A protein has these predicted regions:
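...captures the hydrophobic TM-helix bundle architecture rather than a specific catalytic motif
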Residues: 1-255
């Protein structure tokens, strides 16, 4: 009969820490490559089609605040555990978890607000009675043009005049682009939703890891001499925060 063997049972704390850090760096690298691929696709796509820019809603600003603040108790949790203060470390992890939940709620609320304004999808019925999902066109979005949103074509913002859209170079307003705006797939909305919810999914893994480590602290499996799991959790959590800061700037300010 085979027996389960803990290959790290006789390893020194230094070896365990290096191993967990290496594994976490591999995970972080994989996530970086995933989001780099998506944002690269966004840059290529933006230059080929009409592209909508939206101003940042209050919900997304709050999500940025929560994710940045959450790194503080996460850092303290690791530091306190190294100092042997288990209960204080557990408290800081609980605060991190609550801030992570707040981030997730505000992220979802931010996208829901954009979706309700027309950036999401519409559900219709097929002849067979099934639900058909259609991503909304650019013209479905509501708000004050030039303030709440604007649409670019070939890198230049369209001009709205008398309810019609025109290229910036069409100074005499002779060739309206309204029909194209009303029918063009809102690719920017689709990519924003993918980035938001993909980040939420990865952050949820960090939240689960937090709960596991809170329980490990509670039952005494983590200590000042065995903090490697919490250290790896901290690496992942800080990375998730940095990743959202990058995505926030990329989506709402850079592209």
């Amino acid at each position: 009969m085979s027996q389960n063997v803990d290959v790290f049972s006789e390893a020194t704390p230094e070896v365990k820490l290096r191993t967990k850090k290496m594994m976490m760096w591999l995970i972080i690298f994989a996530v970086v490559m995933l989001f780099a691929g998506i944002t690269s696709a966004l840059m290529v796509l933006k230059g080929k089609i009409m592209w909508m820019h939206v101003t940042v809603s209050g919900w997304f600003w709050w999500s940025l605040v929560w994710v940045i603040l959450s790194s503080i108790p996460m850092y303290l949790a690791v530091k306190l555990l190294k100092d042997g203060k288990t209960k204080a470390s557990m408290l800081m992890l609980a605060v991190t978890f609550l801030l992570g939940i707040s981030f997730t709620i505000t992220q979802n609320a931010g996208w829901t607000e954009l979706s309700e304004r027309g950036m999401g999808y519409t559900i219709s019925k097929t002849p067979e009675g099934l639900d058909a999902y259609h991503w909304n066109p650019l013209g479905k979005f509501t708000g004050a043009y030039g303030e709440d949103y604007w649409i670019e074509s070939r890198g230049k913002a369209l001009v709205q005049w008398n309810g019609e859209f025109y290229d910036a170079d069409d100074v005499n307003h002779e060739k309206p682009k309204t029909a194209q705006v009303m029918s063009t797939f809102n690719a920017s909305g689709a990519l924003i939703s993918v980035l938001v919810y993909l980040h939420i999914i990865h952050l949820a893994l960090g939240l689960i890891y937090l709960l596991i480590n809170i329980n490990r602290l509670r039952i005494g499996k983590l200590s000042a001499s065995n903090y490697m799991s919490l250290h790896a959790n901290g690496m992942y959590w800080h990375f998730m925060g940095i990743l959202w800061v990058y995505l926030f700037l990329f989506v709402f300010f850079i592209y």
